[in-house]
Swiss-Prot record:
Zn(2+) binds at D158, H162. Intact BH3 motif is required by BIK, BID, BAK, BAD and BAX for their pro-apoptotic activity and for their interaction with anti-apoptotic members of the Bcl-2 family. The keyword Calcium does not apply. The gene is Bak1. One of its GO terms (molecular function) is heat shock protein binding. The modification N-acetylalanine is found at A2. Keywords: Acetylation, Apoptosis, Host-virus interaction, Membrane, Metal-binding, Mitochondrion, Mitochondrion outer membrane, Transmembrane, Transmembrane helix, Zinc. A motif (BH3) lies at residues 72-86. In the presence of an appropriate stimulus, accelerates programmed cell death by binding to, and antagonizing the anti-apoptotic action of BCL2. It is found in: Mitochondrion outer membrane. Homodimer. Formation of the homodimer is zinc-dependent. Forms heterodimers with BCL2 and BCL2L1 isoform Bcl-X(L). Forms heterooligomers with BAX. Interacts with BCL2A1. Interacts withRTL10/BOP. Interacts with VDAC1. Interacts with GIMAP3/IAN4 and GIMAP5/IAN5. (Microbial infection) Interacts with gamma-herpesvirus 68 protein vBCL2. It holds the Pfam family Bcl-2. This is Bcl-2 homologous antagonist/killer. It comes from Mus musculus.
Amino acid sequence: MASGQGPGPPKVGCDESPSPSEQQVAQDTEEVFRSYVFYLHQQEQETQGAAAPANPEMDNLPLEPNSILGQVGRQLALIGDDINRRYDTEFQNLLEQLQPTAGNAYELFTKIASSLFKSGISWGRVVALLGFGYRLALYVYQRGLTGFLGQVTCFLADIILHHYIARWIAQRGGWVAALNFRRDPILTVMVIFGVVLLGQFVVHRFFRS
């Protein structure tokens, strides 16, 4: 499958409903994200030790590790691990500027997704979106709000469905297509590009407009 950036969101009528394959991708997103969160958090604990942020909700997620979707989440976590550590400061600074709460998190998440995918969709940007969802859930939990991870999971599935990302993934065979990728230089560059775009778009949209 091609890993490059795809075309931007197509223009469709307001009454067009997602196809069954798109709805399936959105449904599968929840399991993929839970697996991604669990393994990424596990990796951070292994590499950072006591310095890693604690989150029992992430440690006790219900998983099906041998399922295809569970493997997809783990694969994306492995790909995104180095990038998340490299750009941890940028994520934290972004969240400090946005100050997300339970009341505004969905709106912020939606605007970030709109900015990130404005000029097209790629696996790099999808991984960047998952990474931001992970950081968002961790940030809010550290500020005393428990149970928010489940909301972020639902937010992400909804955004994937209604921003044409589900269509893009479905056209490539579903989430299973992500298993074709490994931690190689080309994909790493794509993920870095996605993270950089995320920061640039959000800062421009919220603080310079």
